[in-house]
Swiss-Prot record:
GO terms for MF: acetylgalactosaminyltransferase activity; N-acetyl-beta-glucosaminyl-derivative 4-beta-N-acetylgalactosaminyltransferase activity
Record's protein name: N-acetyl-beta-glucosaminyl-glycoprotein 4-beta-N-acetylgalactosaminyltransferase 1
Acidic residues biased stretches: 642-666
Top-level EC class as recorded in UniProt: transferase
EC number, UniProt record: 2.4.1.244
Pro residues bias spans: 540-550
Biased composition (Polar residues): 627-636
The keyword Transmembrane belongs to this UniProt entry's keyword annotation: yes
Superkingdom of the organism of origin: Eukaryota
Region Disordered, annotated ranges: 51-94, 298-320, 448-493, 531-550, 562-670
Length: 1039
């Protein structure tokens, strides 16, 4: 066993210690370099004053060393790694669902930096995008690679004085000296400031922000409004540069601005805007075209890819549907479907071949198809603002809602009253409920039943006095006393207006015609009125009316008291201490009566003697008026003598009590209880039947309602047609196929000859897999016999194909079969639309990758685009086929579409006249092929036009029911109708689609009109699309 050389170790001890020290020094150097590379260098405790110089420790008068004010910040800076962790939590808020992990497309390597980059930073502008939150900016389809404008700014304070835009400002910050720095951001509306630990965009962290919802904002320079605006102190080094990114979103309100300030982490220092001396460009973009995006940095703040946020959508159309992926199921062989149904001629009566159609009147000859099952294309989430689906007036729905569809359940004891209300017209008064001129005097008599109106001596005859009771006296009427030089003093009592020679009608309008006198017993009317020297007992129950004076308005009518609409001015009262005695009472008119609203309903009380008759010569403004509501007040019957007892008991009040009562009311301010609270019946129930508003719709092309979906086909009809077809199919093949589900049924109705159906069924083959059946069938009405449209292939006699029971029977329409392998060409004219061309090509490549369908081609007609190389972008896109056509001059949509169709050589292929700003569903190719039949059908799908700030993941908008610009048709049919009108629509567009529709219908083709699921037209800005000059300083938005 070898021994340890102890003697040698002792001799070389000094050398071994030296080697150990060198090893430790090398290890510490390695660790230090590694920390520096990660931005967490070993730091010394240094303090920085207001001028940036290092502070020295000082000794106060007591000989104690005073620590610098920044030492607490230095202590906290040692745990910088732990403090930065909470800032990084916003990644999960911005990108939920595991988006916190770094996607593969983050930018880790920065482009070469040059000294001339100093003094400015990169600015990317995303115009015409609604919303005030930064999250709304991230929903933009082109964010962050394809902005509307690329430019630079010289300081981190920007105010374009515009609306509905988003900004992305990025570059490098160069600190002036080493030390701890705080950042703050201020903006209107929301903004976020991201700062990297070094120059790499991948290491950016959110350090300060203004709001998350879009409703938060600050004034310019207001750096301390929100706690989230100010960052934690961060140690920066003057020898390095730090990548930053500033995101800002502005809506259509407020004073737009965004600025970033910084300060040394010292008490009392204010934030200062970061100027050009401390910023530099990320890279120079001045020589790059808009389709060059490899240099654009992608950071955690803004990047492409990753896991998108999973938001709960409110649109039913986004929910999965078997139609979306049914095209991937293998289709049945055409040989298996031969001789299943008997052939029959197909010539619907709604085809207007060779019929003269006026300009733009082809819209009236387009009919809609019925769909089963429900495809949820109805925009239910948009009906809060647009209720046109219900075929009701918007004003009516806003005022009355949907209560007419509900029948309120009757309460016990209210059956007769409710029946009477239902028998009356809604909001119309019954003339029999009003009193004639002779009967109006009865309102002034008494509470006893009146059998006939007593004779009156004149229009101002006083009402008969009530029977005298023991202890009750009535004062005679007293005229108003003159005041201030003979000016008559008006009484504040509630009284009847003087009657003129000719009474005025209750409603100012046409008087009702006189009714012939009918020998009927006069109705007994009980009227509650203000009687002199009487008070209604507060314990007396309120009477109920046999029917409401306004039928249909109140479910439970209440008698209303008579009120004085305009009272005369109150005489001035001396200010002083109020007492309850009569000495403190000022002289007042002897007549004083007051109607109350705050007490029991239908009760009135009087204070003092009766009011005198008012002179008819007084001004109209000072004349006491009785409300019309009081004329309609009807009370129930009252027992004889009941009112007199109440009068006796309540006429004993002293004058002092009256004054005290009035003083207390005046001291309390306005009368309490003047407005009644509505009673709420929480136990009210109602009855309602099933309502299907789809029954109110027809197949007429509705151009007024743009939120309604496809017409719904009744389930019984769809099941009956499917059952007939499956019966014939199994009879032909001996029960080899079993029906799994009905995926889609479309019906075009012809009330004269029959209906056309498109059946799409999922079948299970015996001993095989699942198959897709998608065929047109015709349900011919009994006795309907027509020849073929071109006089060929006469159909057999109707008796040979009509069922014995006389019911319609299915047949196979001749020359109405669609081809599954036909080529589809997308024709798109473009000009200076780099970001939209790139998005369109990306969508087409994704469509090819998802469906595996290579039977389509993209034809781009370029009108000298200057912002990108369209041909190079086409070659770089992963498309199965493409064509590039270059034209000179201004943009002409009609000429561009015609040139694209002329470039297609195969006349038996489909051309789809398309737009650049379209989001296609995955089944778009299958939908175009199914609804285009050569010589028979053309397809004009309805696209959903997205609103500003809306995206396909959260679609808000409306169906473009008037637009026919997206049009699919066989090239042979397109050439036969004459193509596009390039002569009339040369320098303008808008109307060329309607003009083409007129000629297509005149050629005898049907135009299939359906709303496609997930088929959107992106909202986009029209600024700079066709080289239109803009006015400097204009603040009007793009249309």
């Amino acid at each position: 066993m070898p021994r340890l050389p102890v003697k040698k170790i002792r001799k070389q001890m000094k050398l071994l210690l030296l080697l150990l020290l060198l090893s430790c020094a090398a290890w510490l150097t390695y660790v230090h370099l590694g920390l520096v590379r990660q931005g967490r260098a070993l730091r010394q405790r240094l303090g920085y004053g207001r001028d940036g110089e290092k502070l020295t420790s000082e000794t106060d008068g007591r000989g104690v060393h005073a620590a610098p004010s920044t030492q607490r910040a230095e202590d906290s800076s040692e745990s910088r790694e732990e403090e930065q962790a909470p800032e990084g939590r916003d990644l999960d808020m911005l990108f939920p669902g595991g988006a916190g992990r770094l996607p593969l497309n983050f930018t880790h390597q920065t482009p070469p930096w040059r000294e001339e980059y100093k003094g400015q930073v990169n600015l990317h502008v995303f115009e015409d995008w609604c919303g005030g939150a930064v999250g709304h900016l991230r929903r933009n389809l082109h964010f962050p690679l394809f902005p509307h404008t690329r430019t630079t700014v010289k300081k981190l304070a920007v105010s374009p004085k515009w609306k509905n835009y988003g900004l992305r400002i990025f570059g490098f910050i160069h600190p002036a000296r080493d030390g701890d720095v705080q950042f703050s951001v201020a903006s209107d509306d929301n903004s976020e400031f991201w700062l990297s630990l070094d120059e790499s965009p991948a290491a950016a962290q959110l350090v300060a922000f203004v709001g998350k919802t879009g409703s938060e904002w600050t004034a310019p320079g207001e750096f301390t409004k929100f706690s989230s605006q100010v960052s934690k102190p961060r140690r920066l080094m003057a020898s390095r540069r730090y990548y930053f990114e500033l995101l800002h979103k502005q809506d259509d309100r407020g004073s737009d601005h965004v600025e970033v300030g910084w300060r040394a982490f010292l008490p009392g220092l204010k934030f200062e805007v970061i100027s050009s001396a401390h910023i530099s460009l990320y890279t120079d973009e001045s020589a790059l075209k808009m389709d060059h995006v490899a240099h654009v940095p992608q950071s955690p703040a803004s990047h492409v890819g990753g896991r998108p946020p999973q938001e709960e959508t409110s649109a039913d159309m986004l929910r999965p549907d078997p139609r979306d992926t049914f095209f991937l199921t293998p289709r049945m062989e055409s040989s298996s479907l031969e001789n299943v149904l008997e052939p029959c001629a197909y010539a619907p009566t709604y085809v207007v071949k060779d019929f003269p159609i006026a300009r733009y009147q082809g819209l009236q000859f387009v009919y809609l198809s019925f769909v089963y099952p429900n495809d949820y294309t109805r925009l239910t989430h948009m009906e809060t603002d647009n209720k046109c689906f219900y075929r009701e007036s918007p004003l009516y729905l806003e005022r009355f809602g949907f209560y007419k569809y509900m029948k309120m359940d009757k309460e016990e004891g209210d059956e007769d009253e409710e029946d009477e209300v239902q028998r009356r017209a809604f909001l119309f008064l019954n003339p029999d409920d009003f009193l004639d001129d002779e009967d109006e005097g009865e309102l002034l008599d008494s509470l006893e039943p009146t059998e006939a109106a007593p004779p009156r001596s004149g229009p101002q005859s006083p009402a008969p006095a009530a029977p005298a009771q023991p202890g009750a006296t009535l004062a005679p009427p007293t005229p108003p006393r003159p005041r201030d030089g003979g000016t008559p003093r008006h009484s504040r009592a509630l009284s009847w207006a003087a009657r003129a020679a000719r009474p005025l009608p209750l409603f100012l309008g046409r008087a009702p015609p006189p009714r012939p006198a009918v020998e009927q017993p006069p109705p007994k009317v009980y009227v509650t009125r203000v009687r002199p020297g009487q008070r209604a007992s507060p314990r007396a129950p309120a009477p109920r009316a046999p029917w409401p004076p306004f039928p249909g308005v109140f479910l439970h009518p209440r008698p209303l008291p008579r009120v004085q609409l305009r009272a005369p001015p109150r005489p001035p009262r001396p200010h002083g201490r109020r007492t309850g005695g009569p000495q403190a009472t000022q002289p007042r008119p002897p007549a004083r009566a007051q109607a109350t609203q705050g007490g029991r309903e239908g009760q009135a009380r009087t204070l003092g003697p009766a009011a005198p008759t008012v002179d008819s010569n007084l001004s109209s403004e000072a004349r006491p008026v009785t409300s019309f509501l009081s004329l309609s007040q009807v009370s129930g019957p009252q027992l004889p003598g009941e009112g007199e007892e109440e009068e006796e008991g309540e006429d004993d009040g002293a004058p002092g009590d009256e004054a005290a009562s009035e003083d207390s009311e005046e001291a309390a301010g306005p009368a309490l209880g003047r407005w009644r609270e509505d009673a709420i019946d929480w136990q009210r129930t109602f009855s309602v039947g099933a309502v299907d508003f789809e029954l109110l719709r027809s197949d007429w092309n509705d151009l007024r309602c743009n939120v309604s979906g496809n017409l719904q086909l009744p389930e019984a009809e769809a099941v009956d047609v499917t059952a007939q077809y499956m019966e014939r199919l199994n009879a032909r093949h001996g029960g080899r196929f079993a029906l799994l589900r009905i995926v889609n049924v479309e019906k075009r109705r012809d009330s004269a000859r029959g209906s056309r159906f498109l059946l799409e069924l999922e079948l299970q083959e015996r001993g095989g897999g699942r198959l897709r059946l998608s065929e047109y069938v015709f349900l011919r009405l009994p006795g309907a016999r027509v020849g073929d449209a071109d006089g060929e292939s006469p159909e057999p006699a109707p008796a040979a194909s009509v069922r014995p029971d006389g019911r319609p029977e299915l047949c196979r329409p001749l020359r109405l079969a669609w081809r599954q392998d036909v080529m589809v060409h997308f024709i798109v004219p473009v000009k200076n639309q780099a970001r939209w061309v790139a998005q369109f090509l990306a969508d087409m490549a994704a469509l090819h990758a998802r469906t595996g369908d290579s039977r389509f081609s993209v034809v781009l007609v370029d009108f000298e685009s200057e912002d990108m190389d369209v041909e190079r972008a086409l070659r770089a896109a992963r498309l199965p086929r493409y064509q590039y056509l270059r034209r000179t001059g201004n943009f002409e949509r009609s000429a561009g579409l015609q040139a694209g169709v002329d470039a297609v050589e195969d006349a038996s292929s489909i051309v789809f006249l398309c737009d650049l700003h379209i989001h296609f569903p995955p089944n778009i190719l299958d939908g175009i092929r199914k609804h285009c039949v050569e010589g028979r059908l053309a397809f004009a799908p309805v696209v959903m036009r997205l609103s500003c700030g809306s995206s396909p993941r959260d679609p808000h908008g409306y169906w473009e029911v008037n637009g026919f610009g997206l049009f699919g048709i066989y090239k042979s049919d397109f050439d036969r109708v004459g193509g596009m009108n390039t002569e009339e629509f040369r320098d303008q567009w808008g109307g060329e689609d309607w003009e083409l529709l007129d000629r297509v219908l005149q050629a005898g083709l049907e135009v299939e009109r359906l709303r496609l699921r997930n088929f959107y037209h992106h909202y986009h800005s029209k600024r700079g699309m066709w080289s239109v000059r803009s006015r400097k300083g204009s603040r009007t938005g793009a249309s």
